[in-house]
Amino acid sequence: MSLAALGVVFGDIGTSPLYAIRECFHGEFSIPVNTPNVLGVLSLLIWALLLIVTLKYLTFIMKADNEGEGGILALTALIISHSKKNKSERWILVSLGLFGAALLYGDGMITPSISVLSAVEGIQIIAPSFGPLVIPVTIAILAGLFLFQHHGTAKVGSFFGPIILLWFTSIGLCGLVEIVKYPAILKAVFPWYGLEFLVNNHAKGFLVLGAVFLAVTGAEALYADMGHFGRRPIRLTWSLLVLPALLLNYFGQGAVLLSEPAKSWNPFYALVPSWGIIPMVILATLATIIASQALITGIFSLTQQGIQLGYIPRLTVQHTSASHIGQIYVPAANWALMFSTIALVAGFGSSSKLASAYGVAVTATMLISAVLFYYVARDLWNWNRLGLNLLMGMFMLIDLSFFGASVSKLFHGAWFPLVIGFALFTLMLTWKQGRLLLMKQIQDRTLTVSEFTESLAIQQPQRVKGQAIYLTANPDVVPMALLHNMRHNKILHSEVGLLHFSTERVPRVPNSKKVEVIQLNYGMYKIIARYGFMEYPNIRQVLALANQQGMHFRTDAISYFINREKIVTGMKSKMSVWRKKLFALMARNALSATAYYDLPSGQVIEIGVQVQI
């Protein structure tokens, strides 16, 4: 794996040592610092890394790739494209996948906040008087990070890898020094210390699991980034560099707690010698910025996938690199994240308080990923039922334990990512259902392509020389823009293309299968452009590929006709009135087809159509 990829994939999980151990002994549900508790918490944390990250995600979940792509939406699309289940079962699985994706937005708001804030707080160790500056400095760093997004990361990306490599090396060495001083801490590798801790501490021990989970919050990112860097490089880098560095640092923090319990308020920086505090604060800040950048990029990618799959309204998506197609910038998502993270930092005031809000969204997403993986392994791969049930039983027990512990923090801030998740989930389902209802209404008011061509055989309108392309949401029906144009202007161009963009349930579609041209009678063509959910439609590419199949359309001579729907509510249907009004509001504010498909504005004719839903 390239050095640049190191920061993208492992930035989130790599910065967890800043706050994970601290929250167990100095957080909302903290426990006393003593030998049994330190060994128990450390044992739970180590085995969480081994069982959740190494075994569950890197060994099993990453097997479920959608033509190389990972992530919860890719996993959901894999199930949709291969599932033979009835509609209700598919709807449940799709809804689970969508809710998991929606929860990741809540995580995307909290991760930059807690990561950068916990790094900047280190300066208080040297100069406690700088305490009042922590929040303003954190907000300034976050604001700068988001304001820089439209420039892309191509120029600074080459620095990410070396910085993260230095980060892992530094935190590993700091931990190793303390382990040498207190080698007895290595006993925590035995799992019975963790089990004994849970038994002896009863409910309080269970609640501490919510803080232990903070060490593995970046596991879902490893799966999501699989398409960019590959399964094998991620596994190797984890095994040879990241996991050893994390274990050394966590063991080192445990050793510090046993030798100097008073330092439980920030055991990470307690590992660092006094002369190295300032360099470590700078390095930690850079590492958390890189981790935040990776998560922001992931949110941009998730948003693009949601748009392509039809669950998010069309938004502006800008490409920030000519050589790397995956580097994109989504302004709406960027500003929403920016204001949310700044509000969280100002509202919670410390990384310790933010930690109470962190984790519940990720645990829920991990639970959902496990459920979706179960159906893939059972229905698509036909795994042995007994072995699969035992494996998933173990994973579900672990995930449910962490989820239950995280939910206990509901009134301490954990409500925030859940509210965000439910709100976005509602918006996604409303948009999808509204579009289906809208398409049905349009389809009922228009003609099929075959009916239209048959009508031309009976009576043709006046044909004018020229080329026209009509965008259509359904390749089998004539767009209303064409019928309205004929009704009002009484003309039809000599060459007409009915263009339909179809998003497939795969990440990418090869050029050889991307465009299908079906020649109809009377100078008409049906053009079906197929794109994957990781791709961005390109009208010029479509026309170039279509012209290779017998069309002769000139890009500078085409008139593009598109519908401009005005949605009014009132028709009786299964969709509630408030959701119809919400859908109409979303449709009014969605990016126009002209802007989304980058059509030449001087060649576009929009025809208004009123549709009642």
From Swiss-Prot:
InterPro entries in alphabetical order: K+_transporter, K_trans_C, K_trans_N, Kup
Annotated TM spans: 38-58, 91-111, 128-148, 159-179, 206-226, 238-258, 270-290, 328-348, 357-377, 387-407, 410-430
Keyword Transmembrane: yes
Record GO terms (molecular function): potassium ion transmembrane transporter activity; symporter activity
Membrane-topology annotation of the record: Multi-pass membrane protein
Chief location of this protein within or outside the cell: membrane
Annotated localization: Cell inner membrane
Pfam families: K_trans, K_trans_C
Coiled-coil ranges (or none): none
Domain of life: Bacteria
Catalysed reactions, semicolon-separated: K(+)(in) + H(+)(in) = K(+)(out) + H(+)(out)
Keyword annotations of the record: Cell inner membrane, Cell membrane, Ion transport, Membrane, Potassium, Potassium transport, Symport, Transmembrane, Transmembrane helix, Transport
Annotated disulfide bonds: none
Keyword Isomerase attributed: no
GO cellular component, one term: plasma membrane
Stated family: Belongs to the HAK/KUP transporter (TC 2.A.72) family.
Biological role: Transport of potassium into the cell. Likely operates as a K(+):H(+) symporter.
PANTHER family named in the record: LOW AFFINITY POTASSIUM TRANSPORT SYSTEM PROTEIN KUP, OSMOTIC STRESS POTASSIUM TRANSPORTER
Protein name per its UniProtKB record: Probable potassium transport system protein Kup
Gene that this polypeptide is encoded by: kup
